Regions:
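Feature for intrinsically disordered/low-complexity regulatory segments and propeptides
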Residues: 1-148, 152-213, 217-223, 230
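Extended alpha-helical heptad-repeat/coiled-coil "stalk" and oligomerization rods
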Residues: 192-270
Length: 271
């Protein structure tokens, strides 16, 4: 029996899946490597990123010995979730705020913007020309696009929406100094360039991406429980009020994350 031809909206969906699952990790790895080399590569006791066990352990140590990033594996095996953790959520790249407290790039530059759920950054370029802010916004834009795909309740994307997603992606890539040529190539693919074998690969890869995403959210829930216990202990011990306030803010941020990121009942998690 002959297979039914793809509708344009279905083709757009698989193009976007291909961009997110194949091109996002490449862009994020390039960005992470650049961030590492610029911040640590020249420091005594560190080295430029060569993906060796030694340099991955350096990153682990810079994270305080604990991270959700699988540093036991080559960074070529890190998925989008791990790469977001290794960049905008990493302690390694934290910067001081106006009060001198070190915050992750996400806490410092993304959260203050208070984006509505389901929306995107209007611009990923820092208004003040701050490279760290630009990187944070561009990486977060890719995170928002990836999350949107995981939340999708349909395996179809209309042309106008697809064009918007592609433009957001290209803007983020340009801000990160990543070439956009592959995005243009995928965006121009025809149905004949999507053989059934490739569709099956994308479907399986989407399942794995969604599984990793859900595992991350489960980890966030576990972190919330740990923070709740720590916050209680600090209050009992009459800890410094500023420390308690910062911990309470972190607890509230984590508590809000699952409600914003958890896929809905009709989300396309298995295709």
């Amino acid at each position: 029996m002959a297979l039914q031809p793809f509708q344009d909206e279905q083709l757009n969906y698989f193009k976007f899946v291909s961009i997110v699952l194949n091109e996002f990790p490449k862009a994020l790895r390039q960005t992470f490597r650049s961030m590492w080399d610029n911040n640590f590569g020249h420091l005594p006791g560190f080295q430029p990123w060569d993906d060796s066990t030694a340099v991955r352990n350096m990153f682990l140590n810079a994270e305080g010995g604990r991270t959700k990033v699988p540093t036991n594996l080559s960074y070529e095996e890190w998925d989008c979730t791990a790469l977001f953790q290794a960049t905008i959520y990493a302690r390694s790249f934290a910067l001081p705020d106006s009060a001198g407290h070190y915050q992750t790039l996400s806490d410092l530059y993304v959260k203050p913007r208070k984006l509505a759920h389901g929306s995107f950054h209007v611009s990923v370029v820092s208004p003040g020309g701050n490279e760290a802010e630009t990187f944070a916004l561009a990486i977060d834009q890719l995170r928002l696009l990836r999350n949107l795909l995981c939340h999708s309740a349909s395996a179809e994307i209309v042309k106008g929406t697809f064009d918007q997603y592609v433009q957001h992606t290209k803007d983020a890539f340009k801000a990160l100094g990543v070439k956009t040529d592959p995005i243009d190539v995928i965006g121009g693919w025809s149905e004949s360039e999507f053989p059934i074998k490739e569709i099956c690969k994308l479907e399986q890869a989407m399942k794995e991406e969604s599984r990793a995403y859900i595992e991350f959210l489960e980890g966030v829930s576990s972190d919330i429980d740990e923070l709740r216990e720590l916050l209680h202990a600090m209050k009992v011990a009459n800890a410094n009020k500023d420390d308690i306030a910062r911990l309470e803010q972190k607890f509230n941020d984590l508590r809000e994350a699952p409600s914003q990121d958890t896929p809905g009942e009709n989300s396309v998690l298995t295709l």
